[in-house]
């Protein structure tokens, strides 16, 4: 399979570059900016892209690649900071600009170049997305300008003449961002026309490759997989099951913190896939340990430890553990930025492999979230499973604020189900990234049937996002919110007030705990 390497210099758009490349049907991989030429050769890419970054190439602390990457003979495209890296390496001059460019700008494509730039073939003067404070003041020898903007006379250039065979191209703007009108065409021109890549990356080809890999890795050994009912674990389990059949042992732990009727729905669905699944009802154990615990961090840690204990008890003689690790998790561990600050501890089975001396099978570790869903469709997984909203590992424990009891969980389940039902019936469910109800540790005075009430307050939360990293609160219609509130107060005993959360992320997080 032909591939592209994206060297990461710390840009907020690095993952977006990789995703845009894959949308063209070409496999892309992200590696740190300081990856050695030897390592790059081992990957055998057909093209290299240098990402943007937050630093300046003329600073003493500038992050720069190994000079050897420019001698590999592999077509290269520098984006934003990547352009400046190329300019500096080949002897150009980069300095701080008196005018910074952030946001939309218009580029003018050079019209007098002979022959025409292959990168800008069929690209007219158009709007692009800029995000830079430095610019090229002097072009390196052996390069020519291919586009300019009002503030940057050399906002795109390419190797030419004596250096033409290097096939090195550079853009000061971001072709990966949707605001760059011809961004996809520019990437296509570079990867398909210039680098000569034939698109061969698809969900089908990925599945075929993974089935062979899983079968080879597992051999005749048994494999265990913890299933949550979420998209990632379901797709991972189905793929591994397709590869090794009855060698896979799936464990679904009902921790008493699931949504209404979730255990039954998940088991019914999984039974149609021919997977061997053990349902463990550990709800009493989880709720006993969570009794009187109000701290969200303590809740998460208790749930994590209890899950490991319950999971261990279901172990047979398995040698491998399936995990639904996704590509963003892999990138985070190798990126220039390093691991992010922990905002909340994550409940997962990360401690299981080392603790139980298990080897890992991670069939989704090369995929982004949208690609996981595409693979799931190819595997025949039902759309309502694939398009479910994200659900936190600790379940409803972090949506019942304060102490967690069965009574409070049941109140929340009933209210949450009404909210989701209404979203689906009005076609709004797929228009929001995530929606849920939160039971607050607050009671308020109300009046029902001429009687005073003192009952729970419920908050509704719905957000719009593309990746969950940032999010805006969803501006749902007022009449819709009124209908949901009215149903909840009338149908769910124990709630007399409903509020709607209008906080964005940041500063708030999507989940309340």
Swiss-Prot record:
Pfam families: GATase, GMP_synt_C, NAD_synthase
Catalytic residues of the enzyme: 80, 174, 176
All copies of domain Glutamine amidotransferase type-1, residue ranges: 3-200
Record's GO cellular component terms: cytosol
Catalysed transformations (reactions): XMP + L-glutamine + ATP + H2O = GMP + L-glutamate + AMP + diphosphate + 2 H(+)
InterPro entries: Class_I_gatase-like, GATASE, GMP_synth_C, GMP_synth_GATase, GMP_synthase, GMPS_ATP_PPase_dom, NAD/GMP_synthase, Rossmann-like_a/b/a_fold
An example molecular function term from Gene Ontology annotations: GMP synthase activity
Keywords: ATP-binding, Glutamine amidotransferase, GMP biosynthesis, Ligase, Nucleotide-binding, Purine biosynthesis
Gene3D superfamilies hit by this protein: 3.30.300.10, 3.40.50.880, HUPs
Entry's EC annotation: 6.3.5.2
Main function: Catalyzes the synthesis of GMP from XMP.
UniProt-listed PANTHER family: GMP SYNTHASE [GLUTAMINE-HYDROLYZING], GMP SYNTHASE-RELATED
Protein name, as recorded: GMP synthase [glutamine-hydrolyzing]
Lineage: Bacteria, Pseudomonadati, Chlorobiota, Chlorobiia, Chlorobiales
Gene: guaA
């Amino acid at each position: 399979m032909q591939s592209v390497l994206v060297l990461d210099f710390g840009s907020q758009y690095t993952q977006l570059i990789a995703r845009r490349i894959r949308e063209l049907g070409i496999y892309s991989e992200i590696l740190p900016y300081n990856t050695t030429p030897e390592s790059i050769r081992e990957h055998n890419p057909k093209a290299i892209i240098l990402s943007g970054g937050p630093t300046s190439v003329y600073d003493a602390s500038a992050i720069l690649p190994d000079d050897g990457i420019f001698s590999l003979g592999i077509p290269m495209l520098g984006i934003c900071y990547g352009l400046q890296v190329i300019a500096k390496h080949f002897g150009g001059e980069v300095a701080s600009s008196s005018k910074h460019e952030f946001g939309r700008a218009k580029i003018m494509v050079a019209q007098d170049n002979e022959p025409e730039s292959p990168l800008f073939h069929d690209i007219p003067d158009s709007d692009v997305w800029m995000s830079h404070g430095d610019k090229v003041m002097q072009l390196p020898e052996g390069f020519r300008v291919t586009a300019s903007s009002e503030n940057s006379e050399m906002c795109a250039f390419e190797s030419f003449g004596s250096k033409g065979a290097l096939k090195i191209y550079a853009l000061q703007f971001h072709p990966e961002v949707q605001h760059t009108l011809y961004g996809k065409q520019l990437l296509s021109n570079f990867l398909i026309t210039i680098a000569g890549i034939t698109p061969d990356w698809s969900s089908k080809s990925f599945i075929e490759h993974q089935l062979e890999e899983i079968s080879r890795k597992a051999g005749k050994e048994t494999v265990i997989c913890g299933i949550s009912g979420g998209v990632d674990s379901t797709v991972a389990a189905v793929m591994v099951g397709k590869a090794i059949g009855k060698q896979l042992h799936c464990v679904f732990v009902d921790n008493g913190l699931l949504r209404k009727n979730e255990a039954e729905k998940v088991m019914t669905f999984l039974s149609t896939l021919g997977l061997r699944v053990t349902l463990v009802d550990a709800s009493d154990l989880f709720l006993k340990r969570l009794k009187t615990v109000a701290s969200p961090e303590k809740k998460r840690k208790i749930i994590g430890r209890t899950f490991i204990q319950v999971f261990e008890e279901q172990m047979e003689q398995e040698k491998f553990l399936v995990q639904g690790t996704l590509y963003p998790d892999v990138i985070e561990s190798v990126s220039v930025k390093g691991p992010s600050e922990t905002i909340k501890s994550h409940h997962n089975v990360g401690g299981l492999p080392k603790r139980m001396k298990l080897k890992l099978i991670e069939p989704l570790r090369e995929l982004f979230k949208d690609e996981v869903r595409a693979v799931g469709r190819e595997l025949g997984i039902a759309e309502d499973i694939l398009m479910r909203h994200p659900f936190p590992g600790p379940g409803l424990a972090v949506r019942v604020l304060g102490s967690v009891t069965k009574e409070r969980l049941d109140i929340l389940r009933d209210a949450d189900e009404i909210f989701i039902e209404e979203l689906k019936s009005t076609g709004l469910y797929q228009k929001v990234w995530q929606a849920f109800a939160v039971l607050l540790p607050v009671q308020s005075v109300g009046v029902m049937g001429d009687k005073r009430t003192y009952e729970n307050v419920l908050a509704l939360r719905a957000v719009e996002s593309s990746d969950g990293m940032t999010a805006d609160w969803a501006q749902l219609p007022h009449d819709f919110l009124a209908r949901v509130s009215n149903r909840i107060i009338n149908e769910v005993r124990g709630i007399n007030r409903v509020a709607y959360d209008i906080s964005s992320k940041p500063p708030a997080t999507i989940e309340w705990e």
